[in-house]
Amino acid sequence: MEKIRKIILSEKEMPRQWYNIQADMPNKPLPPLNPATHKPVGPEDLAAVFPMELIKQEVSTERYIDIPDEVLDLYRIFRPSPLFRAFNLEKALGTKSKIYYKYEGGNYSGSHKANTAIAQAYYNKEEGVRRITTETGAGQWGSAMSFACHHFGLELLVFMVRVSFDQKPGRKLMMNIYGAKVIPSPSTMTAAGRKVLEMYPDSPGSLGIAISEAMEVAVQDPYTKYSLGSVLNHVILHQTIIGQEALIQMEKAGDYPDVVIGCFGGGSNFSGIAFPFLREKLLNGKDIRLVTVEPASCPKLTKGKFMYDFGDTAGMTPLLPMYSLGHNFIPDKIHAGGLRYHGAGVLVSQLLKDGFIEAKAKLQRECFEGGVLFARTEGILPAPESNYAIAGALDEARKADLEGVSKTILFNLSGHGHFDISAYEKYFENNLPDHELSSAEIEKSLANINLPDLM
C-alpha cells in the first residue's frame, strides 16, 4: 500500500472562521484587572493600546468569529499548511506509534506567527492606525508583523530582545527587508529600557522588558497602537486556524490523535493546534491529551504560581490571572528566544488549573538532540522553539513502546530554524549549556514582584 506522507487541503477547504475556546470553557478565566483600582478592565482601559475590534475579540464568548476576506486573501499565500506523517522519524525510533506534525514554517515569516500578524495589521489599518510598535524574542513575530504591516501600509517599530538580537542578526535583516525598524531591548529609547540598563548594564533583555518599551512608545501617540505576538486571547483566537485545518487533515488520513503537543512560550502555537481538539473533547467527549512543553529554564506552567501579575516588566499592562514566575524575571539565555517569557496566557492558565491540559519542562540539549534527529530524518531544520515539541513527541512515542501500545501523536512544528544555525553550531561544539530554574530562584523572583494577592 502506498504511503501518504503529507495531507494537503485545497484553498476551498481552508476554515473561514476562527474558533474561540472561551465559548466552551467550563470555568471562564478571571477578568484582567486595572492595576490602579484592582477593578476589571473595560474597553476604555485598552483603547490607547489596541484597536476596538481586537478588544472585542479579547472578551468575546462567541464560539466562532468570521475571518475577514482581506485576511483570508493573504492567508491563501501559504494556507492551508501541510500535515505530514513522520514515517522516517518513526523508523529511526523503531516505534509502533504514528507521529504526525503540522508544519507552520512554510510562510514568509517562517513560523506560525503570520496567522495573527496579518489579522492584527488588518484591524489596525481599518481603524486608521498609522504605526504599530511591538516586541519580538527570537524574531519570528517581528518578521511576521513586518511583512503584514508593509502590506497594509503601516509603519512598524520592533523592540527585539537583546540576546536574540545578538544571536540572530539574520532576523533583524529580514525585518529590515520587510520595512521595519528594529531596536535591541533594553534600549535607551524608553524610560523602561533606561531603568533596566541603569540596574543591569549588561542585561540580555526579556520579552517582558521589550513589551514595556513597545507599549511606552505606543501610548504617546494617538495614531500608534501596540501589537502582541502571543499570550492574549485575540492572538490565540487567530492561531486556531492551525488546529481546525489539522482536524480536517487527520480525518482525511483516517486517523485521530491520542495526544496533541506544542512548545510553550506564551501560548499561541500550542493553543492554535490544541484548542480545536479540546473543543472536540469538551463537546463530543473525544478521548485526547493536550500537552505543552516549556523550557526548564523558564518553567511558568510547571513551577510558576497562579496569580495576578503584569504581562510586562514595567507594569504597563493590566494585571492578568496567569501562571507566572514574576514579571521581573529574566530568563536564562537559551536559544529558544520565543519561549523566554515569564507568564502564560490567561486561557491556557485556566485550562491547566482545571486539568484539561498537561505541562512538561525540558532541558535545552535534549530538545536540540531531538531537533537534529528530526532534521536528519524528515528533512526540515526546526526552530529551537519547535524542538521542545519534538522532544515531547519523542517522549510520548518511547513511553508508548515501553507500555507495549501504539499511540497516534500530533505535534505542531511551529517554524523552521534557518536563522538559528549558530545555536546548532553551539550544540555540536558541546557549548549549549543546560539550565534548570531552581526553587530558590523562583521564590526570589516571586518575592520581588511587590503585588497584593488578588486571587
Predicted segments, located by residue:
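Active-site/ligand-binding loops adjacent to catalytic centers
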Residues: 64-66, 190, 196-234, 254, ...
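Active-site-proximal loop->helix
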Residues: 141-204, 300-313, 421-429
